[in-house]
Amino acid sequence: HLLSRRQRQMCIRDSNYTVREMLMRVDRRISEKILTTIEEVNMDTLALAESDEEVKQSLEACDYTVIADEGILRAASADTLQRRHEIEDHDFFYEFFKRLERNDKKIFVIAESQKAVDEAEEFLLGLFDRARISGKGVLDDSPGCSENLVNEINIVSPDVIASFLPSPSQEKFLLHNREKLLMNLWYGIGNNKFMGKKHGFIGKIRKMLDVKRLTHLINTYEHR
């Protein structure tokens, strides 16, 4: 993939941060009660930003973009082994939600249908069983839905909005409602691929178990 100059500027500003550095920056902003917006960005989102002015504005206004597609790193010539592994395993997502769980932060989940929002909640609780899901809401095409969702969110007044909306709905909702939402942090996860495969962490655990099983089998065989 080749990135345009605008695409490079949009994603390269944060791609040099390690996950640890990003988390420290976000923690600092949260402790200072500064409204913070984070978006996971993949190649499709960047392509949309080229053709849709509102998506472009929304992404440019985000405080942090998290690269969700290692192809972006390669195209932006910012590819390092550490960053590639962090992106493959979605380390920021995992470490950030571990912090939310540990600190008992109120999380409001949004998606494009009741089925999608239920699946997103199940996905999060499957990984972070003590995560505090304080509310969930749907953004679809029905009249007044956007205003109703803003009201639902503000009644809960969550620490974090976790958005699983697809692009461009996610970026447009944030662009038009950022100033109205009572929240500390917006995390636009979108429909990035790790929703389907859970998280690299699970894969790591499985690999570790496989290695242990293999070691056990070898030891058993050797001691016969």
Regions found by a protein language model. Give the residues of each.
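Metabolite-binding pocket within alpha/beta catalytic cores that recognizes anionic/polar moieties
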Residues: 13-99
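A short, gly/pro- and small-residue-rich
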Residues: 55-61, 171-193
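Proline-aspartate-enriched helix->loop->beta-strand connector
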Residues: 153-167, 183
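Single conserved hydrophobic/aromatic residue that forms the stacking wall/gate
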Residues: 1-12
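A charged, well-structured terminal subsegment
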Residues: 215-224
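Short glycine-rich anion-binding loops that position phosphate/pyrophosphate groups of nucleotides
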Residues: 43-44, 165-169, 192
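Conserved beta-alpha
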Residues: 73-145, 152, 156
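Short, flexible loop segments at boundaries between secondary-structure elements
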Residues: 139-143, 182-214
